Swiss-Prot record:
Trimers of one alpha 2(I) and two alpha 1(I) chains. GO terms for cellular component: extracellular matrix; extracellular space. The modification 3-hydroxyproline is found at residues 682, 946, 961, 964, 967. Residues 56-73, 880-894 have a biased composition (Basic and acidic residues). InterPro entries: Collagen, Collagen_superfamily. Residues 1-974 are annotated as: Disordered. This is Collagen alpha-1(I) chain. It comes from Scelidodon sp. (strain SLP-2019) (South American ground sloth).
Length: 974
C-alpha cells in the first residue's frame, strides 16, 4: 500500500544524494495453474463492442409434439349414430413463410494489449526523520478501480455429478400476441383425411444465456514496496507509470477510528483506453448428444365453445352420381325470420348433396347460463337447424393442476447478449493473499501529493541495543540555538575512572592573554569565613574525576538514516466491517428473449357442468311450401341431437380446393406487467486459495529524486557553565572507563494535542484496473421461491415462421368426435324422403377410451388466429430436473428470436467471498499526471522520547595556560 508520511520534524543538515541503485534481475513468469472448476456466474460486466458477424448454426431437431389439451364440455345426450360422410381430401400444405435472416452473431473480440510500462523515475533522497506524529484519522476509502478486461475462458472442466433436483422456475411471461391473420373461406367439413406429412420443424429457439466465464487466473503477488522518500522542494517531474504494488503486509492492531474527512473534489475522468484488436475466433464446438424429449405439456386453455352446427334433413338414398363442384350461388335476399316449425319425422337418408359454397362466418353467440339439472329424457326427433350462436364468455380458469414431474434440463442455449449491469454488490471479505507476481518495471516518481493528516501517537518502541561507537564524523556547522528542552531525570553516578598518573611538573609558561569572560556560573554561594593567608604550597596532584553530570538537553535531530529492510509481515488484521449495499443500478437494456421452457404435465380436468333439461317431444307438423330464405335469427339455445340416419354411399373424391390467402397481421397486444422480484439466495461458499506463485524479481532502484525541503530549526540545548581551567600541562589521556549503567527511563511525556485534520487533497486520477479475481465456487442451491402472484395476461407473440413439411406419418386411428364445426352453406334441397319410424331412445353409452395417438399428419393451411385466452394461474413449482446430457450440435444454427421486454432489476445479491488472486496481467499504459494536492497543515510536535543510553566519558581536555598570580595574602599572625 502507499505509506503516508507523518508530520514534518525539525530539519537537520541536508544530506548528500546517494548513488542510484542498479536494477535487479528480471524474474521468470511462473507456470500456468491448473484449470479450475467452472465458477458460478459473476455479475454481468459491461457490454462489449460487437464482434464480426458469425456463421449461422444448424437447425435443431424438432421436439416431439405435446399431448393435446383436454376439454370437457357439458355432457350431452347420446345421439344416434350419424351417417358416415365422404372422406375429405387431404388439405394442401400451408405455404411456408419466408424465414427472416438470422442476425449474425459476432465472434468475441480479443482483449486489447496493454501498453509498455514506462521507466521508473529516480529515487528521492531520504528526508529528515520527523518525530512520530499523532495518528491521523483513517482516510476515506479510495475509488474502486475500473473493471479489468475479462480473461479468455478457461478450458471446460469435467462434468460434475448430477445435482439435486432444484426448484422449477416460475412460468415466464407470455410473449407478445401474434398478429391475427385474416380469416380464410370456410371449407367444407368432410371426414378427417389421412394424416399428412409431418410439419416442418419450427424456428429454433432464442439464443440462451451467455456461458459462464472461465475461472480467473490468480493475481500476481505485489512487489516489495520501496522506501518512501519525503517530498523534495524541487519542481515536480513528469509522472511516470505506477510502480508495482508492494506486498500486502499483515494488518496491525486496528487503531482508534479517525474522524471522516471531507470528501475531496471529484477529479476529472481519465482518458479512455484504446480498444484492442478483436481476438481470434474460437473453435466450433462439438455436436452434443441429442437430448431426451421434454415432458408432456400442460393442456392449453379451453377454447371458446362454438354453437351447435345446423343439421340437414337426411335425404333418401340416391344413386351416387359423379361428384361435381358447383359454383357458389348468389346470396338470397334477407327475409324476416319465420316461426320455428315442428320437427318432422326422421326421413330416410338422401343422397349426399353437392358441396355448397362457403358461407360467411356469423357473429359469435354468448353462452347462456346453465339450466337446472333435469332428468335425462329420451331423445326427441331432430329439430330444425338453429342459427349459430355467438361466442360464449370466457370461462374461469380451472383449478390449479398438480405439480408435474421434474423435466429434464434442455440443451444449453446459444449465448445471449450481455444483460444489464447489476447494482453494486456489498464489499466482500478480503481474499487470501495471492502468490507474488513478476515485478513490473520501475515507474517514474509521481508528483508530490498532498500532505496527510497527522497520525495518532505511536506506542513507544522497545529499547534498542546500544550500537558500536561510530567513527567521529566531520564537525558540522554550529546549529541555531534551540528552545530549552525539558530537563531529564538525573541518572545514577557512574563508576569512578582510574586515577591518572601524576604529570611531570611543567615550566612556568608565559603569561597568557586574558581569557574571554566566562558564562555566568551557578548560584552565588554564601561568603565563607576568611582564613589565614597561607603560603603558596606545592602544586598538587590531579584530582579524581568527579561524578558525571546530569544528561544534557536533547540535541539536534540527526540526519535520517537509510531505510532498513522490510520486516516480517505482522499478524493478519481483523476483518473490516461490511459495507453498506450500494444503490440499485439503472435498468439495463432489454435482454434477449429466453428459450421456451419445458412443457408441464397436463392438469386434471375441471368438474363437469350440469346437463340442461331435455326438450319436450314435438308433434309432427304438416309439410309446408318452401319459403324464401329467412334472415339469420338471434342465437337460440342449442337443441338436442336428433337421430342419425343410416349411412349413405361413399362419393367420389373431390379435387383439392384452392389455396387460401395469407392473413393480415393484427395489432400487437399490450405489454404485460413485470413480475415480482425473486428472493435473494444465500451466499456461496468461499473459494479455495490458489497455489502460491514464484517470487517476482526485485524491481529497479529509482534514480535520484529532487532535494527535500529544509525543515524548521530544532530547539537548541541550554549552554552549560564553562569549567575552570586546570593547572599544569596536559596529562596523558586516561583509559576509557567502563560504560555506565543505562539511566532509568524518563517519565512519559505529555501527549501532544491532536493535530488539525489536514484539508483533503484533490482526488487523484483513476488507477489502473486491478486484475480480475477468479470466480468463486458455484453457490449452493437457494431455497425455492414462493409462487408469485398471477400476473396479467401478457401480449401474444408474433406468429412463428412456418417450417418445412415433415415426412408423411402413418394413418392414425379415428379420434374422439370433435366439436361442431361452423354452419355450412345450405346445399341444394334434396327430394323429400319417406318418413322413417322414430327409433327408440337408446341408453347413454359409456365414454369410449381415447384412441392411440396417431402420427403427425400433414401440415394444413394456417387457420385464423384465435383470440388470446386468459392466462391460467401459475402452477406450483415443481422440483428441479436433473441436468440433461449435452446434445449433439445441430447442422445449422437457428434464427435469432425477437428481443423481449426488459425485466425489472433484481434485488442486489449479497457479495460472495473473494476468490483466490489470479496471475498478474500485463501492465497498463501510464496514466496522465494528476493535479498536485494542497499542502497539508503541519502537525503538532510529538512528545519527548525516553532518554537515550548514557554516553562515554570524554577524554581529558588540554591543560590551560597558567592563570595570573593571585593577590598577596594577608600578613600572618605575629
Amino acid at each position: 500500500g502507499i505509506s503516508v508520511p507523518g508530520p514534518m520534524g525539525p530539519s537537520g543538515p541536508r544530506g548528500l544524494p546517494g548513488p542510484p541503485g542498479s536494477p535487479g534481475p528480471q524474474g521468470f513468469q511462473g507456470p500456468p495453474g491448473e484449470p479450475g472448476e467452472p465458477g458460478a456466474s459473476g455479475p454481468m460486466g459491461p457490454r462489449g463492442p460487437p464482434g464480426p458477424p458469425g456463421k449461422n448454426g444448424d437447425d435443431g431437431e424438432a421436439g416431439k409434439p405435446g399431448r393435446p389439451g383436454e376439454r370437457r364440455g357439458l355432457p350431452g345426450t347420446a345421439g344416434l349414430p350419424g351417417m358416415k360422410g365422404h372422406r375429405g381430401f387431404s388439405g394442401l400444405d400451408g405455404a411456408k413463410g419466408d424465414a427472416g435472416p438470422a442476425g449474425p452473431k459476432g465472434e468475441p473480440g480479443s482483449p486489447g494489449e496493454n501498453g509498455a510500462p514506462g521507466q521508473m523515475g529516480p529515487r528521492g533522497l531520504p528526508g529528515e526523520r520527523g518525530r512520530p506524529g499523532a495518528s491521523g484519522p483513517a482516510g476515506a476509502r479510495g475509488n474502486d478501480g475500473a473493471t479489468g478486461a475479462a480473461g479468455p475462458p478457461g478450458p471446460t472442466g469435467p462434468a460434475g455429478p448430477p445435482g439435486f433436483p432444484g426448484a422449477v422456475g416460475a412460468k415466464g411471461e407470455a410473449g407478445p400476441q401474434g398478429a391475427r391473420g385474416s380469416e380464410g373461406p370456410q371449407g367444407v367439413r368432410g371426414e378427417p383425411g389421412p394424416p399428412g406429412p409431418a410439419g416442418a420443424a419450427g424456428p429454433a429457439g432464442n439464443p440462451g444465456a451467455d456461458g459462464q466465464p472461465g475461472a480467473k487466473g490468480a493475481n500476481g503477488a505485489p512487489g516489495i514496496a520501496g522506501a518512501p522518500g519525503f517530498p523534495g522542494r524541487g519542481p515536480s517531474g513528469p509522472q511516470g507509470p505506477s510502480g508495482p504494488p508492494g506486498p500486502k503486509g499483515n494488518s496491525g492492531e486496528p487503531g482508534a477510528p479517525g474522524s471522516k474527512g471531507d470528501t475531496g473534489a471529484k477529479g476529472e475522468p481519465g482518458p479512455t483506453g484504446i480498444q484492442g484488436p478483436p481476438g481470434p475466433a474460437g473453435e466450433e464446438g462439438k455436436r452434443g448428444a441429442r437430448g431426451e424429449p421434454g415432458p408432456t405439456g400442460l393442456p392449453g386453455p379451453p377454447g371458446e365453445r362454438g354453437g351447435p352446427g345446423s343439421r340437414g334433413f337426411p335425404g333418401a338414398d340416391g344413386v351416387a352420381g359423379p361428384k361435381e363442384r358447383g359454383s357458389p350461388g348468389p346470396a338470397g335476399p334477407k327475409g324476416s325470420p319465420g316461426e320455428a316449425g315442428r320437427p318432422g319425422e326422421a326421413g330416410l337418408p338422401g343422397a349426399k348433396g353437392l358441396t355448397g359454397s362457403p358461407g360467411s362466418p356469423g357473429p359469435d353467440g354468448k353462452t347462456g347460463p346453465p339450466g337446472p339439472a333435469g332428468q335425462d329424457g329420451r331423445p326427441g326427433p331432430p329439430g330444425p337447424p338453429g342459427a349459430r350462436g355467438q361466442a360464449g364468455v370466457m370461462g374461469f380458469p380451472g383449478p390449479k393442476g398438480a405439480a408435474g414431474e421434474p423435466g429434464k434440463a434442455g440443451e444449453r442455449g446459444v449465448p445471449g447478449p450481455p444483460g444489464a449491469v447489476g447494482p453494486a454488490g456489498k464489499d466482500g471479505e478480503a481474499g487470501a493473499q495471492g502468490p507474488p507476481g513478476p515485478a513490473g518495471p520501475a515507474g517514474e516518481r509521481g508528483e508530490q501529493g498532498p500532505a496527510g493528516s497527522p497520525g495518532f501517537q505511536g506506542l513507544p518502541g522497545e529499547q534498542g541495543v546500544p550500537g558500536d561507537l561510530g567513527a567521529p564524523g566531520p564537525s558540522g556547522a554550529r546549529g541555531e540555538r534551540g528552545f530549552p528542552g525539558e530537563r531529564g531525570v538525573q541518572g545514577p553516578p557512574g563508576p569512578a575512572g582510574p586515577r591518572g598518573s601524576n604529570g611531570a611538573p611543567g615550566n612556568d609558561g608565559a603569561k597568557g592573554d586574558a581569557g574571554a569572560p566566562g558564562a555566568p556560573g551557578g548560584l552565588q554561594g554564601m561568603p565563607g569565613e576568611r582564613g589565614a593567608a597561607g603560603l603558596p604550597g606545592p602544586k598538587g596532584d590531579r584530582g579524581d574525576a568527579g561524578p558525571k553530570g546530569a544528561d544534557g538537553a536533547p540535541g539536534k535531530d540527526g540526519v535520517r538514516g537509510l531505510t532498513g529492510p522490510i520486516g516480517p509481515p505482522g499478524p493478519a488484521g481483523a476483518p473490516g466491517d461490511k459495507g453498506e449495499s450500494g444503490p440499485s443500478g439503472p435498468a439495463g437494456p432489454t435482454g434477449a428473449r429466453g428459450a421456451p421452457g419445458d412443457r408441464g404435465e397436463p392438469g386434471p380436468p375441471g368438474p363437469a357442468g350440469f346437463a340442461g333439461p331435455p326438450g319436450a317431444d314435438g308433434q309432427p307438423g304438416a309439410k309446408g311450401e318452401p319459403g324464401d330464405a329467412g334472415a339469420k335469427g338471434d342465437a337460440g339455445p342449442p337443441g338436442p341431437a336428433g337421430p342419425t340416419g343410416p349411412p349413405g354411399p361413399i362419393g367420389n373424391v373431390g379435387a383439392p380446393g384452392p389455396k387460401g390467402a395469407r392473413g393480415s397481421a393484427g395489432p400487437p397486444g399490450a405489454t404485460g406487467f413485470p413480475g415480482a422480484a425473486g428472493r435473494v439466495g444465500p451466499p456461496g461458499p468461499s473459494g479455495n486459495a490458489g497455489p502460491p506463485g514464484p517470487p517476482g524479481p526485485v524491481g529497479k532502484e529509482g534514480g535520484k529524486g529532487p532535494r527535500g525541503e529544509t525543515g524548521p530549526a530544532g530547539r537548541p540545548g541550554e549552554v552549560g557553565p564553562p569549567g575552570p581551567p586546570g593547572p599544569g600541562e596536559k596529562g596523558s589521556p586516561g583509559a576509557d572507563g567502563p560504560a555506565g549503567a543505562p539511566g532509568t527511563p524518563g517519565p512519559q511525556g505529555i501527549s501532544g494535542q491532536r493535530g488539525v485534520v489536514g484539508l483533503p487533497g484533490q482526488r487523484g486520477e483513476r488507477g489502473f484496473p486491478g486484475l480480475p479475481g477468479p470466480s468463486g465456487e458455484p453457490g449452493k442451491q437457494g431455497p425455492s421461491g414462493s409462487s408469485g402472484e398471477r400476473g396479467p395476461p401478457g401480449p401474444v407473440g408474433p406468429p412463428g415462421l412456418a417450417g418445412p413439411p415433415g415426412e408423411s406419418g402413418r394413418e392414425g386411428s379415428p379420434g374422439a368426435e370433435g366439436s361442431p364445426g361452423r354452419d355450412g352453406s345450405p346445399g341444394p334441397k334434396g327430394p323429400p324422403g319417406a318418413p322413417g319410424a322414430p327409433g327408440a331412445p337408446g341408453p347413454v353409452g359409456p365414454a369410449g377410451k381415447s384412441g392411440d395417438r396417431g402420427e403427425t399428419g400433414p401440415a394444413g393451411p394456417a387457420g385464423p388466429a384465435g383470440p388470446a385466452g386468459a392466462r391460467g394461474p401459475a402452477g406450483p413449482q415443481g422440483p428441479r430436473g436433473d441436468k440433461g446430457e449435452t446434445g449433439e450440435q445441430g447442422d445449422r444454427r437457428g434464427f435469432s428470436g425477437l428481443q423481449g421486454p426488459a425485466g425489472p432489476p433484481g434485488s442486489p445479491g449479497e457479495q460472495g467471498p473473494s476468490g483466490a488472486s489470479g496471475p498478474a496481467g500485463p501492465r497498463g499504459p501510464p496514466g496522465s499526471a494528476g493535479s498536485p494536492g494542497k499542502d497539508g497543515l503541519n502537525g503538532l510536535p510529538g512528545p519527548i522520547g525516553p532518554p537515550g543510553p548514557r554516553g562515554r566519558t570524554g577524554d581529558a581536555g588540554p591543560v590551560g595556560p597558567p592563570g595570573p598570580p593571585g593577590p598577596p595574602g594577608p600578613p600572618g599572625p605575629p
